[in-house]
Amino acid sequence: MRFETRYTYDFVKRFLPDDCRRILEVGCGTGELAACLSRDGHEVVAIDIDPESVAAAQRVGVDSRVAKWPDFDDGRFHAVLFTRSLHHIHPLDRAVRHAADTLRESGRIIVEDFAHESADEKTLRWFVSTVRLLEATGSLAADDEFLQKVLSKTETLKAWRQNHEHELHTAAEINAQLEKTSSPVIREDAACYYRYAANAVTRTKERNSILQAFAEQEQTLSAEGSIIALGRRFVILRAR
């Protein structure tokens, strides 16, 4: 299992309700997480708006479908997962409300996302220095478009914002909508900067170790208050 999938999988498994049978993943990508959950014995339905991603998920045995949230409806679920997808979905209020309406009793909405608006100069200096270190060791592909945009700019924060201004919801907006469900909300910060390097890592054997070290450094430094963690996680606990 790739490190980034394991990182999300461990979070999701920690918060799945007891006797969780039916799971919906919104924004499944190529289906790696959904496949892992299916192997655990859960009935997983996975949707994505990209036909190629859905086809890839189907090839690994996932019940994946081309569909757009919140227009999709396939009965009730014990858990609805938004795996780095909710910041893209419009309208946000309807997306959250439909997820809540889709839950069975004691079901849960589990969200993994990122606070792109939280990036500051100090945090991005750490991010750039870490990426440059990996690049210097030959661990990163030189042609990764996003990383080259950030590394080539003298104003890193400006470059970051230019790459995250395409109608993306902020973590604060997501949190506000989740609070409107009138259910308890669990919140966690998490590592996420490592994901920007994930597709560029070229040293296959060491890939998971490299990304794990990247993520652990983000977690440690953010816990100390030295940087701001990028990842945000939310869990809605629906009452019986």
Residues covered by each model-derived region:
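Class I SAM-dependent methyltransferase SAM/SAH-binding core
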Residues: 30-71
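Conserved class I S-adenosyl-L-methionine
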Residues: 20-27, 110-143
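Conserved alpha-helix/loop element of class I SAM-dependent methyltransferases that forms part
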Residues: 2-20
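A conserved beta-strand element that flanks and buttresses the S-adenosyl-L-methionine
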Residues: 81
